[in-house]
């Protein structure tokens, strides 16, 4: 987490406009590992690990009035549960191409693309990142994603990158201190 984040003016200008925060899941909300627990030869239980600091950040984002969501290529009941716990409004799973989901969210919210932030880590995220007003790469994203991003987190995927992005947005808006007072468990 970047608690003493110094925000360059151009980045601040982008971040202060954000009203919708979208993100990838595997390699962004999680560290990218996919753990499978075999139950039978045909059935496996998928286990995902989510970061508590990222969760607190998502709760603060919701409290601040940001609309949040995720777009992922995989189907996951663990993700669905976590997304609901974090008050995510938009949950798009089984999306091999992310642009149709992104465009639908932009249409549903009625916000300009300059008011949308997207956090990603890998090649399927690049088309959305090219359109989002604030494109964020997690610290361990592939080089092509980092090159596309307006900001790369110091934190790694699944270890505070979402929280760092939310802090960037809320600090740019000048409401971070007020959100600290509203933090809840």
Segments predicted by a language model, with ranges:
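Mg2+-dependent phosphoryl-transfer enzymes with acidic/Ser/Thr/Gly-rich catalytic loops
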Residues: 43-44, 51, 91, 99-185
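Fold-independent oxyanion-binding glycine-rich loops
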Residues: 24-26, 32, 74, 121, ...
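Short, conserved SAM-binding/catalytic segment
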Residues: 85-86
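Active-site neighborhood of HAD-like aspartate-dependent phosphohydrolases
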Residues: 2-64
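Substrate-recognition element of Asp-dependent hydrolases with the DxDx(T/V) motif
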Residues: 34, 57-82, 92-93, 129
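Short secondary-structure boundary segments
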Residues: 25, 73-74, 95, 139-142
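A general structural signal for stabilizing positions within well-ordered secondary structure
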Residues: 9-12, 82, 143
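Short secondary-structure boundary/capping elements
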Residues: 49-53, 71, 94-97
């Amino acid at each position: 987490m970047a608690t003493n984040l110094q925000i360059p003016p151009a980045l601040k200008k982008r971040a202060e406009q954000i009203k919708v925060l979208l993100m990838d899941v595997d390699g962004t909300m999680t560290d990218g590992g996919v753990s499978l627990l075999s139950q039978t030869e045909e059935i496996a239980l998928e286990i995902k690990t989510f970061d508590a600091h990222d969760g607190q950040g998502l709760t603060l984002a919701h409290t601040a009035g940001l609309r949040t969501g995720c777009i992922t290529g995989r189907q996951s009941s663990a993700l669905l549960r976590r997304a609901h716990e974090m008050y995510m409004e938009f949950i798009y799973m089984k999306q091999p191409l992310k642009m149709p989901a992104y465009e639908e969210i932009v249409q549903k919210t009625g916000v300009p693309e300059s008011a949308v932030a997207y956090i990603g880590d890998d090649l399927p995220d690049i088309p959305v990142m090219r359109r989002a007003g604030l494109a964020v790469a997690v610290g361990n994203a592939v080089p092509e994603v980092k090159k596309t991003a307006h900001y790369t987190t110091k934190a790694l995927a699944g270890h505070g990158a979402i929280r760092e992005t939310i802090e960037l947005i809320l600090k740019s808006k000048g409401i971070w201190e007020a959100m600290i007072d509203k933090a809840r468990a």
